[in-house]
A protein has these predicted regions:
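Transmembrane-helix motifs of polytopic, lipid-linked glycan transferases
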Residues: 94-118, 158, 310-313
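Hydrophobic/aromatic-rich transmembrane helices and adjacent perimembrane loops
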Residues: 148-155, 192, 295-309, 324-375
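Membrane-interface transmembrane helices that cradle and orient dolichyl/undecaprenyl
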Residues: 53, 156-172, 209
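Membrane-interface alpha helices of multi-pass inner-membrane proteins
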Residues: 172-195
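Signature aromatic-anchored transmembrane alpha helix within multi-pass, membrane-resident enzymes
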Residues: 12-22, 228, 232, 323, ...
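Membrane-interface micro-motifs in multi-pass membrane enzymes
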Residues: 67, 71, 117-164, 186, ...
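Short hydrophobic/aromatic helix or loop-helix immediately within or flanking a transmembrane segment
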Residues: 45-51, 64-87, 273-288
Length: 528
């Protein structure tokens, strides 16, 4: 049998090969775009966590994490990357590129669904195309920066793919429950975007079966089981995190602003901010795009946003009708996440886009699944091909921009050259310098103007004077937000006059002849 004949008889081979090639190309494109963003201490701290896991501390004993653990997706991936590449700033870019390439491919696969032939291709390319070229500034920051909700989309999309492709068997709800637990251990976003969405969609289908169709339990047991599995997964995720800590593992604090409702008086402001953040997610924001080229790209992304909105509206129209299970879950997940964002405390400019990131692939999948067929029947593939080519051009434009130097790399080199390897600094100068230096210089973050150790994305032993030492403090003159974190006058009042002081660019390095950890306030969180 010839190779072409083999492909005709086994088209899945062609699909698999195409996905592999597309994934590889997308990875290198997103790696190059990720390098245009200035790395800071947030992803650097998570890279250090993965380094500790790789070096004999898989439970991260003694670590203070953020309110998102990233323990299910990003940290394991980072461990693998660092096993191969070592502890380097490039690790963050590699992770971000791998994650986003996977999200784009999974979005395309989920949009394709069970469709075959031309319609299947149109569905996949339509959905994947909407995600294809994140905008250069905010798109890179929100989607290709490093650990920040995007990785959580992987278990969520895989769960929905399972629901889409698996037969209605008893074992599917059990696996779905495990996968939902996995996602929620990684990030609470999965509770709203996945667990609650599956529970709502399955509950609606059960009610439809009983009230509208008069079906018996023998026919609606599957959706009832999915709803129960989704609800159990919420408790299971909390139990897993608690058991990890009980076993001596990391401490993850509760969400910063809790799960309560924000005052209704601020609702108009939050709706406006949510709208701006949605534009950022889809690359259609104009506030950070000063050139004619980038403004044109923002206009182009408005087309993708319009298709996503149409897909969501089509999904809403069929939600209580004959929509399939995955479509109902996507609609429910989109509405739940948007409602949680608008009515909760997390809808802040730019950073709030992270909190609703699932809206991007969910609405793109809805566009692919619900608009792909009509567009194919209308023979609009040439128009879609032109749009896809424009998006590829936008991605190429992003990849030609200058590579950014990680923040404070000059400081890391200066400190190492002067044999200053263990000190204190503001948060934005702390873990990024540690990563910049490959771990040879360690800066522990301070808060309280320079008096208190910050218990966030750090090993508690770094600030324990019984086992660690710090003999200098770094302050900065600018930017003002960083300068206010550690104030020289407050440092002198708490730690006394330094033995000597160095000035290097915007940095002031105050060196002492004793262990500063003996005078720094050290909070006790999680028993550490």
């Amino acid at each position: 049998m010839s190779f072409s004949g083999l492909l005709r008889r086994h088209p899945r081979i062609l699909w698999a090969a195409g996905l592999a090639v597309a994934g590889l190309v997308l990875y290198f494109c997103y790696l190059r775009q990720a390098q245009t963003y200035v790395l800071n201490s947030d992803p650097a701290g998570q890279a250090l966590e993965a380094w500790a896991m790789w070096h004999g501390n898989p439970l991260l004993r003694g670590w203070w994490l953020g309110d998102i653990s990233f323990y299910g997706v990003e940290l394991p991936l980072n461990v693998i990357i660092e096993m191969v590449n070592g502890l380097r700033t490039e690790d963050v870019h590699i992770l971000a590129a791998l994650v986003y390439a996977a999200v784009v491919l999974l979005t395309a696969l989920l949009a394709r669904g069970t469709a075959r032939g031309r319609e299947g291709v149109v569905r996949a390319l339509l959905a994947g195309g909407i995600l294809l070229a994140p905008s250069l500034v905010y798109g890179t920051r929100v989607l290709i920066q490093g650990p920040n909700h995007t990785g959580t989309l992987i278990p969520i999309l895989l769960t929905l793919l399972l629901l889409d492709r698996a037969p209605e068997r008893w074992w599917v709800p059990a696996i779905v429950g495990v996968m939902l637990t996995w996602g929620q251990v990684n990030d609470p976003l999965a509770t709203f975007a996945a667990a609650a969405a599956v529970a709502v969609a399955s509950g609606v289908r059960v009610l439809q079966g009983i009230v509208r169709d008069g079906r018996t339990a023998r026919t609606w047991w599957y959706d009832a089981s999915l709803a129960v599995a989704a609800l159990i997964s919420v408790a299971a995720a909390h139990l897993v995190l608690a058991e990890i800590h009980t076993a001596g593992g990391f401490y993850a604090p509760p969400p910063k602003y809790g799960y309560g409702l924000a005052p209704l008086s601020t609702l108009p402001t939050r709706i406006h901010v949510a709208g701006s953040n949605i534009l950022m997610l889809f690359g259609a924001d104009f506030t950070s795009e000063p050139t004619a080229a980038t403004k044109a790209l923002a206009v182009l992304h408005l087309v993708g946003l319009a298709l996503a909105v149409l897909g969501l509206l089509a999904g809403l129209r069929g939600f209580l009708g004959r929509a399939d299970r995955v479509t109902q879950a996507l609609v429910a997940g989109t509405i739940i996440v948007l409602a949680a964002g608008v009515f909760g405390h997390y809808m802040l400019p730019v950073v709030g886009a992270h909190e609703i990131v699932s809206v991007l692939p969910f609405s793109a999948v809805l566009a692919g699944r619900l608009l792909g067929g009509p567009l194919t029947r209308a023979r609009l593939e040439p128009v879609l091909a032109i749009g896809l080519a424009c998006y590829l051009g936008a991605l190429a434009y992003n990849d030609t921009q200058p590579i950014a130097t990680p923040a404070h790399q000059d400081l890391a080199r200066w400190l190492e050259a002067h044999h200053l390897t263990s000190g204190l600094a503001g948060y934005w100068e702390s873990t990024i310098v540690t990563l910049d230096s490959g771990g040879r210089v360690r800066l522990v973050a301070l808060i309280g103007k320079g008096t208190t150790i910050k218990p966030y994305e750090a090993d508690s032993s770094w600030s324990n004077p019984a086992v660690s030492r710090a003999n200098f403090i770094v302050t900065v003159k600018w930017p003002l937000a960083d300068a206010h974190q550690v104030r020289p006058a407050v440092v002198r009042a708490r730690f006394g006059a330094p033995a000597r002081t160095y000035h290097f660019r915007e940095y002031r390095i105050m060196v002492y002849n004793y262990n500063l950890l003996t005078r720094a306030t050290r909070p006790s969180l999680g028993g550490y």
